[in-house]
Amino acid sequence: FVSSSSNVDNEIEVLRSKSLSGEVVNNLGLFVTYIDEDEFPKKELYQASPVLVSLTPQEADKLPGRMEVAMTLQPTGVMDVQMRVGEKEYRRQFEKLPAVFPTDEGTVAFFANNDTLFAVRPENVTKERHITAFINRPFSVAKGYANSLSIAPTSKTTSVVVISLKNTNPVSYTHL
């Protein structure tokens, strides 16, 4: 005989697990954050960056620290990239997207974000834009999400739980 409260406790432990958080972080790409450097104050661009930066979660987990990818989008379609990770720095200019940038830490790929609003797509940039992407270690991000998660049964006799997440970006947690 297994009580419903022990089943709920087991489910809560599964929901709190770092491995489940890791899958969510990897699948949603939450280990990459984008900042619009032209806004004051600077603004996070959750799912609204005109350019998406990609590094596999496996490569990102091996980073010695956070990778900073500063991008300057020109009205001509050219994009200048400056990357910094640890003591290393890389620079490259791309004439068009998609583009790839092999580094010692892995291959960083750049894509136009066709899901963004028409006005912020790379091909519609009318003035120079400055976007910075930060690639973090997915496991560290997953730990942060797991630690920010609050899961509790609604009562002692129910199998319904309330899940809440403390997050500074109200848009991003709606996808979790």
Tell me the role of every PLM-derived stretch.
Residues 154-171:
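Structural beta->alpha junctions
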